[in-house]
C-alpha cells in the first residue's frame, strides 16, 4: 500500500509539474500579447492563468512536502505551508482583479484601439494550452488528491476565459466594437474573484484552526455516544486540519471497561471509519464531568437514551 501511495503521488507530481510549466509559459505569452495588442481581455485572461499557475504550484508543493516526514522541530510536518501560500495567493489575486476592474472602467470612458488579429492568435494559443493542461490533470488511472482536482477546476475556469477572449477578438475583427473587450475582461475577472474569495476564506479558516467544513463536532459527539454503549459523553473536543488531514483531541467519559485498550481502539476505529480521522488523541474519564462545557452534552445524551428506552418499551407493549 505504501508503494502504491508513493506511485500515486509521483504520478500526481509529474502531471502537476507539466501543467504548471505549460500554464506559466502561456501566461507570459498572454501578458506580452495583451500589451502589444492593447487587449484588456487578454490581460484579464492572463490574470486568470496566473491563478491557475499559482494553484498548480501550491498543489505541486503540497504533493512534494506531503512526502516529507515530520521531525522534532516540525511535528506536524510542512503541510501548513500550502495553506499559507494559498492565503497569500488569494490576496494577490484580489488585488489583480481590482486592477483589471479599474482598467476596464477607464476603457469605457477612454476607449483604446485593439489589434484583433494578434489578440485572436494569442487567445487561441492560450486555449490550446489550457486544453492540454486540463487533459494532463485528468489523464491516468491513479487516484488524484483534492489538490489535483482543485487545480483542474482552476484550469477549466481559465479555459472558459480563453473562449471569452477569442469571442471578443472575433467581434472586434468583424464589427470593430471595442467595448466588448473590457466587458469580457470584467466577466473573466469575476470568475477569478469568485475563486480567490473562496480560497481566501478557506485558507483563513484553516490557518485559524477551524473545524474542517465536511465535519460536524455536534454530529460526531452524538454518533460516538449512541454507537459505542460504553461511551457516556464526549466533551472538550478540538477538531482542526493540517493539509488534508483532520486532527482531533477529545475527552471521553466512559463506563469503566474490562479492557481499556480495546475500548480505546474501538473509538479510534470508529472515528477513522466514519470520519476519516487517522490521528485522534483521546483522554478516557471514568467519572462524571462537572465542567459547564460538558453538561449540555451529558443532558442531551441522557435524553437520547431515555427516548430510545421509551421507544423500545412502546414497541414491546405493542407486541403484547
UniProtKB/Swiss-Prot annotation:
Keyword Membrane: yes
Domain of life: Bacteria
GO cellular component: plasma membrane
Protein's membrane topology: Multi-pass membrane protein
Keyword Ion transport: yes
Keywords assigned: Cell inner membrane, Cell membrane, Ion transport, Membrane, Transmembrane, Transmembrane helix, Transport, Zinc, Zinc transport
A single MF term (Gene Ontology): zinc ion transmembrane transporter activity
Matching InterPro entries: Cation_efflux (IPR002524), Cation_efflux_CTD_sf (IPR036837), Cation_efflux_TMD_sf (IPR027469), CDF/SLC30A (IPR050681), Zn_transptr_ZitB (IPR023500)
Location of this chain's protein in the cell: Cell inner membrane
Principal location class: membrane
Transmembrane residue ranges: 16-36, 43-63, 85-105, 117-137, 153-173, 180-200
Purpose: Involved in zinc efflux across the cytoplasmic membrane, thus reducing zinc accumulation in the cytoplasm and rendering bacteria more resistant to zinc. It may contribute to zinc homeostasis at low concentrations of zinc.
Family the entry assigns: Belongs to the cation diffusion facilitator (CDF) transporter (TC 2.A.4) family. SLC30A subfamily.
Name of the protein in its database record: Zinc transporter ZitB
Organism of this sequence: Pectobacterium atrosepticum (strain SCRI 1043 / ATCC BAA-672) (Erwinia carotovora subsp. atroseptica)
Amino acid at each position: 500500500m505504501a508503494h502504491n501511495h508513493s506511485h500515486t503521488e509521483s504520478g500526481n507530481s509529474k502531471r502537476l509539474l507539466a501543467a504548471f510549466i505549460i500554464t506559466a509559459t502561456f501566461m507570459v505569452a498572454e501578458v506580452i500579447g495583451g500589451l502589444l495588442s492593447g487587449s484588456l481581455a487578454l490581460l484579464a485572461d492572463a490574470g486568470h492563468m496566473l491563478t491557475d499557475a499559482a494553484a498548480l504550484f501550491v498543489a505541486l508543493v503540497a504533493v512534494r512536502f506531503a512526502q516529507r516526514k515530520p521531525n522534532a522541530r516540525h511535528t506536524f510536518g510542512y503541510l501548513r505551508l500550502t495553506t499559507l501560500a494559498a492565503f497569500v495567493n488569494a490576496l494577490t489575486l484580489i488585488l489583480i482583479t481590482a486592477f483589471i476592474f479599474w482598467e476596464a472602467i477607464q476603457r469605457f470612458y477612454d476607449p483604446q484601439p485593439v489589434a484583433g488579429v494578434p489578440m485572436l492568435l494569442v487567445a487561441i494559443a492560450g486555449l490550446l494550452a489550457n486544453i492540454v493542461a486540463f487533459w494532463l490533470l485528468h489523464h491516468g488511472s491513479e487516484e488524484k488528491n483534492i489538490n489535483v482536482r482543485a487545480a483542474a477546476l482552476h484550469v477549466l475556469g481559465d479555459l472558459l476565459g480563453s473562449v471569452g477572449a477569442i469571442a471578443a477578438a472575433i467581434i472586434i475583427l468583424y464589427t470593430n466594437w471595442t467595448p466588448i473587450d473590457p466587458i469580457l475582461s470584467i466577466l473573466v475577472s469575476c470568475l477569478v474573484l469568485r475563486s480567490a474569495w473562496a480560497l481566501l476564506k478557506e485558507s483563513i479558516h484553516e490557518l485559524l484552526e477551524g473545524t474542517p467544513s465536511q465535519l460536524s463536532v455536534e454530529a460526531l459527539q452524538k454518533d460516538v455516544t449512541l454507537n459505542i454503549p460504553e461511551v457516556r459523553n464526549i466533551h472538550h473536543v478540538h477538531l482542526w486540519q493540517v493539509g488534508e488531514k483532520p486532527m482531533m483531541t477529545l475527552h471521553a467519559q466512559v463506563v469503566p471497561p474490562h479492557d481499556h485498550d480495546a475500548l480505546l481502539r474501538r473509538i479510534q476505529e470508529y472515528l477513522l471509519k466514519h470520519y476519516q480521522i487517522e490521528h485522534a488523541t483521546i483522554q478516557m474519564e471514568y467519572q462524571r464531568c462537572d465542567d459547564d462545557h460538558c453538561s449540555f452534552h451529558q443532558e442531551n445524551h441522557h435524553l437520547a437514551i431515555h427516548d430510545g428506552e421509551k421507544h423500545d418499551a412502546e414497541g414491546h407493549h405493542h407486541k403484547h
